[in-house]
Amino acid sequence: MAPRKKAVTKKKTVEKSPPIEEEIIEEPVDEIVESDGDDKKNKKKGKRKSSKKSKKEKEENVEEEEQDQEEEEEGNKKQKEENDADKKSRKHDEHRKKRDSKNRRSHSKSDENEEGEEDDEERRKKRRRRKHREKRKKNGNKEEEEEEEQDDEHEDQNVEEDEEDVNVEKQKQQQQQSDFDEEEKEEEKEEEEEEEQIEIKKRSKKRNSIDSGRKDKSKKRKSKKKKRGQNDDDDDDDDNDDDDDDQDEEKEYEQDEDVNQESIVSEKEEEEDEEKQSQGSEDEEKQSENERRNDQDYTDRERERNRSRDRDSRDYSSRSDHRDYRDRDRDRSRDRDRDYRDSRDYRDRDRDYRDRDRDHYSSGGSSSSSRDHRDHRDRDYRDRDRDHRDRSRDRDRDHYSSSSGSSSNRRSRDRDNDSKRDEKSSSSNNSNNSTSTTSNNNASSNNVKIVQPPKENFFSNYRAIQSSIIPTHNKSKFGERILSIAPTEPPPNFQIPLSKPYRDDSLQQNNDNNNNSSNNNSNNSNNNFNNDNNPYNNSNNYNMNNSNTSPYNNSNNSNSNSSYYNDNDYNNNNNNNNNSNNNNNNNNNNNNNNNNNNNNNNNNFNNSNSNSSESKPNYFNNLSNVFNQITKPLENYKNNGKNENNNNNNNKNKNEDEKRIDLVQTKLSLKSSKSTPQTYNEKEFKVQISNIVVKKLKKYYKTKITTKEDFQYLGKKFTDFVITKERGNQTINKDSEKKIEKVIDNYFEKKEVYDRKKDKDYKKDDGDKLINSSIDISNDSNLSESSITITSTSTSTSTSALTSPKTTGTTTSTITTVTSTSTSSIENTKILVDDEKFKTNIQNETSKESNSI
């Protein structure tokens, strides 16, 4: 063998190597003895000792390696002998398995489990014994049975002795598990009986098909066995036994023919029963699937009904809410489309279309056939689109129609359609604008340019198209058709039917102002506020003082007197304390005066729950805003050197002053007013801010503000500060109160007690103006713990940006608050309003300080 030769060569090399090392080591020893010097001798001695130790270690290592190699060789020899024996036994076992599987057809795969080859042999022997016993019982040969049983026992003993020599280790394991083997054997016996019954049935089936060629196969088997017997001398006894078994099996086949017929009949009956059971189970499954589908359909319908009810119950109160609902509806429609897409009908129908396309269009052909295929395909696509349309229409009908609430469903559907239409129109306008800016202006381009029409076309100054405009020699059928379609009379003007006493007279006032503004800028006191550069141009808004629309007034007015006030701060020629009415026509007469004198009167506005019987209904609160929205875009057209509009405005009839505004514009303004913040006039804005400042300063009263005069001065100071910081912005948002509160808190954060005399901004000359003359302050009852009278004033000088440089004005608002020492909460707020005709005391109940913001 090759590995043995290598081991021998290693031994030779190891034997030659030590003497070479001895020669190398002996030479320096002689030199060391002859050399002088003690240091050198000591060093050489150390080297000599180390060399001797290394020599001994090497010799020991070589001996250990030789011993290991010898042990390995012996182990290899033993393993080879064992492997040879195992190979022989394996060959015999494999031969037996092949022979049994081909000839006997009795062993199933369950016999070849992990139990080992020994268990298989024992089973085979036991089966043989059982067969012989059954045969002998039939023949009545009991004596032979006893003899054969004894022979079998002797054979078993011999076999066990042979197996003990070969498989010593396996027997040790079996001895440890002897307790478990007995139980397993009992179970194995039961399994063997069941397997035999199954094998008998299988054999009966095979016999019917293999009766004709059985004899030929048996002859071939015998010839093969003879050849194998010559090659395998050790297995002669087993071969003889197998031949006997084959003969016995042939006899069994003849005896079991009757049994086979009965088994076949029984098997057929069992198969029929199984088929019936399988059919019954399939029917049950179909019924369960149908029930499940019906339940699903019912739940889907209920879901859709609930969705429609939820959608109808919503209130589209503002645009932001409407936008949210629109997004939700869009998501729901997508979910609904997905449900329909996943439904069975949809999938089956699309599958039919797809299969038809594959069958019709996949195969090629001539031009005529391809043309037919193309027509057929187009027809199919048309049918498919029609089906999609019908499905979407049915889906919308199911969505918007229900047993109850059909009108509300119709309303929600109309809302959805309106919103979609608005989106489409806005997108189309944006696309038109973008294309007009980006496209090149070529002379040959026939793009239609949309020019904004003049202001006249909005108001019944309509002219019919004249046929003389188009020249006669260039007339065509298309032009004649246009002239035949063109109207000859002006279209009807759809207007709001309002009675005269309740119409919006601000329109008349605006027309009067326009007539006067072309001649003089100083004719009216209101002309100072009609300029485009003036940020306080709010003279046209007369209906914005309604306490219902103001977020800062907590009163609930059912009448509209609070929405009208006399704008007397800027037109005081007639001494409004003597002659003032609540009628707008008188105000218009006052507005057209030529004097610019402004009297410093305390003109308090009406912000109350007035219970007057003669009050205007608050139907149209924001008509003036709508009119401004219509007229402002047309100012550019009017100012481009075209005086036709001015001439037309000057030559208008008196009936044109009583024009109404379209319904569509009013609806848009009413919707937009809900979401937009509240805007005020200059006078209103001052008073609203003073109210907020007083409300926030109340928190520091009696803690850091000790006197009433200090409180009044601080109210004036903070109102002026806020107005100057706003720089013409007269809108009050939700965040305005928070901003003012933050400013006041930062001011009092580092101060313990406030004294106005130490304040740099305070002037001694202004002390008399802080206190309102209409209130008696001399009494000490007003300064008691139970009630405190507070007046907050706001003044404007020529240097401030609140008014124009030519005019000065003062506004005051007197507020009476009743507070308690423990909670310091407002119980009542009184706004005293001085007017020529209306003098009322208003009480507004408010919540505690924590809930006031």
UniProtKB/Swiss-Prot annotation:
GO terms for cellular component: chromosome. Residues 75-87, 287-361, 370-400, 411-425 have a biased composition (Basic and acidic residues). InterPro entries: SRI, SRI_sf. GO terms for biological process: regulation of DNA-templated transcription. Residues 20-37, 60-74, 112-121, 143-166, 179-197, 232-260, 268-286 have a biased composition (Acidic residues). Residues 1-11, 42-55, 88-107, 124-139, 216-228 have a biased composition (Basic residues). Residues 426-447, 510-613, 636-652 have a biased composition (Low complexity). Pfam families: SRI. This is Uncharacterized protein DDB_G0283697.
